[in-house]
From Swiss-Prot:
A Gene Ontology cellular-component term: mitochondrion
Naturally occurring in which organism (per UniProt): Bos taurus (Bovine)
Recorded family membership: Belongs to the isocitrate and isopropylmalate dehydrogenases family.
Activity regulation as described: The heterotetramer and the heterodimer composed of IDH3A and IDH3G subunits can be allosterically activated by citrate (CIT) or/and ADP, and the two activators can act independently or synergistically. The heterodimer composed of IDH3A and IDH3B subunits cannot be allosterically regulated and the allosteric regulation of the heterotetramer is through the IDH3G subunit and not the IDH3B subunit.
Protein name stated in the entry: Isocitrate dehydrogenase [NAD] subunit beta, mitochondrial
Transit peptide: 1-33
Amino acid sequence: MAALSRVRWLTRALVAAPNPGAWRSLCTSTVAQASSRTQGEDVRVEGAFPVTMLPGDGVGPELMHAVKEVFKAASVPVEFQEHHLSEVQNMASEEKLEQVLSSMKENKVAIIGKIHTPMEYKGELASYDMRLRRKLDLFANVVHVKSLPGYKTRHNNLDLVIIREQTEGEYSSLEHESARGVIECLKIVTRTKSQRIAKFAFDYATKKGRGKVTAVHKANIMKLGDGLFLQCCEEVAELYPKIKFEKMIIDNCCMQLVQNPYQFDVLVMPNLYGNIIDNLAAGLVGGAGVVPGESYSAEYAVFETGARHPFAQAVGRNIANPTAMLLSASNMLRHLNLEHHSNMIAEAVKKVIKVGKVRTRDMGGYSTTTDFIKSVIGHLHPYGG
């Protein structure tokens, strides 16, 4: 347990360091150096890393089952602490929300499914999913949209990253009826949070060796709100002369993503635009079932699918594609500095897709979720072996 305590101490030290928000998601290499290990070798501990698991709604529980089965087969040293929070299954309450928050604050790392938000207004404008992200200050959502070898789509060899500010903007939950039949919805944009997400995007590009950041906005219409966001991006860009900076209006960005997505590298944008672009870009490489995502605060990391879709119509039919969730789980292991297990699982998933014999319906095949899980387990082997 001493080794585990040492790694946790190092992680907390990194979190407490100056400007932690920009580097929390990128700290695994620092931990690796501090623990004096060879690259690709896991921390050998007597216990397991505690991780909060939130299955969510729709096919979320089925996808989490896939994660648990693959982790078990790969002997991953992770212990899941499972909680349930659902507005559609009447499993949501202030008490349950506090239990989830307590677990996530203790463990610092979580893997979650989509918590579906009902459209009906029941007296509370902020959904439990939104409240969870706000309370943990999960300001940066990162979605890596990358083509999977062996799976042909309209655009191949695509590799771009979408970074979304997800604690303000249109998701402020500030709505009211100013007069009968007239609803006002407030969009909140602050200099502090706009600068923070811009710096996160440029730090990410620097760390990952990417050459360009594109700020997506609608400042031609929302001159003050999006104007402030764009101004902050421009100011931060000046601090990174080696990174090319471009700006693009959101509607043009949507068209350009469909026509020529290869022009993009890292895109940074406010909340609502990010939600839309995440899903649009996922469709370029195969859909919601194949794109992983993650969200970061200065202290916490949450791993999830890139396109948050509950896929309710597939519940119980054993047809959901676990690719996105398994790749997200692999990213979580890398965040925990479990490089060996992370690579082993990611390579197994990619091998199954490349071979092409086992594919779920969304990928044009007839295989079940169970078939896919078994095939991934069958392709597990020590990375590099």
